Regions:
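The feature encodes the CheY-like receiver
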Residues: 15, 57, 84, 102
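Short hydrophobic/Thr-rich beta-strand motif most characteristic of the beta2 strand and flanking loop
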Residues: 26-33, 41
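Acidic catalytic/metal-coordinating carboxylates
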Residues: 34-37, 60-63, 68, 87
Length: 117
């Protein structure tokens, strides 16, 4: 059975690249482009891991992460351009399991996914 991943980012090219790379590794990938859509998808389906951007339309990644934590322990990796130490600390305090800053190396992202799952 393949691993199910939710990728959440409002930058379509980033989503497309991550999706392609993870699908090459045999993962089943769903995509969301804003915070509300991500939260709905996380409530409707069971994912093995969620890659979550911080700066999203409608609802930011911190809020999405916090709300997902109210009903799920799914691993969440923040994947964001916000690289300040305080942002990283907040992400982890809101319930993220890991925090990767953009620009990122897709091999590092895959390695962290495998380490968490």
């Amino acid at each position: 059975m393949s691993r199910k991943v939710l990728v959440v980012d409002d930058e379509k090219l980033i989503v497309k690249g991550i999706r392609f790379s993870l699908e090459q590794d045999g993962m089943d990938v769903d995509c969301a482009y804003d915070g509300e859509e991500a939260l709905e998808m996380a409530q409707e389906k069971k994912y093995d891991i969620i890659l979550l951007d911080l700066m999203l339309p409608k609802m930011d990644g911190f809020e999405v992460c916090q709300q997902i934590r109210e009903f799920s322990n799914v691993p969440i990796v923040m994947l964001t351009a916000k690289g300040e130490d305080m942002d990283k600390i907040l992400g982890l305090e809101y319930g993220a399991d890991d925090y990767i800053t953009k620009p990122f190396n897709i091999l590092e992202v895959k390695a962290r996914i495998k380490a968490i799952m």
